Amino acid sequence: MANFVLVHGAWHGAWCWRHVTESLIRAGHRAHAVTLTGVGERAHLLGPLITLETHITDVIQAIESEEMTEVVLAVHSYAGMLGTAVADRMPGRLAHLVYVDAVVPRPGESWSSTHASATRESRLAAAAASPSYSFPPPDPSVFGLEGADHEWVKRRQTPHPGHTYEAPLDFDPVRVAQVPRTFINCTRPPLATIDVIRTRVTDPKFWDGAWLAGSRVVELATGHDPMISAPQALTQCLCELAGLAAHT
């Protein structure tokens, strides 16, 4: 049995992991999906005081309160920032860190600094114009979703706290590198806003020593929300990675 903690990306909530969580539990694993402050069923808490540190604490507290060790921490999209921070602060509690089409920051980077200037300026302008200092979700079609999946995600998405977008993340890459890491690269279609990250983790020219060189890359032929568009394939991948973690 493996212990999974699943963390959603921007505009989502624990709801997006529903099918994966159910499948992991049926397979005999323990699975806990986190909803970050200000989004999902916690959208009523959205406000300008939510920071990157708030969300890092959300994940750490979930691990602590569930009394989990040997955690397979799967982080989606924006939550790559959070997974990196958790690996830095409590590497001994993690068995594997799985970046699901996620941000893989360098020390001192913010999430916004991995984006093109037009994307960055648009989101920051939207946040500045919002009383809650947040920016709205995109149409789910950008995640490669169609039909019922598209409509479900469109109904469920909520604005994302803007200060989490701007804040740089300081961490020790040597400490994070103690944790086995895998990047799941979703390729059909690839999300343009993580092109920088995709290149960073798949092209050895951009590796920063052991920090990225020690990472494994797995491809899934689905869009940016694989927990929705390909839940069984993602579940199988996570179970395989948990098996690897058990033998390291």
For the regions a language model picked out, list residue spans one by one:
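Active-site glycine-rich loops that stabilize anionic/oxyanionic intermediates
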Residues: 9-12, 77-78
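Active-site loop/oxyanion-hole signature of alpha/beta-hydrolase fold enzymes
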Residues: 36-72, 88-89, 113-117
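Conserved alpha/beta-hydrolase
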Residues: 21-44
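Conserved loop-alpha-helix segment in the C-terminal half of the alpha/beta-hydrolase fold
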Residues: 187-221, 225-228, 233, 240-241
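Flexible "cap/lid" loop of the alpha/beta hydrolase fold
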Residues: 88, 92-94, 98-139, 164-165, ...
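Gly/Ala-rich beta-loop-alpha elbow adjacent to hydrolase catalytic centers
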Residues: 74-79, 83
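Active-site nucleophile elbow and catalytic-triad environment of alpha/beta-hydrolase enzymes
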Residues: 155-175
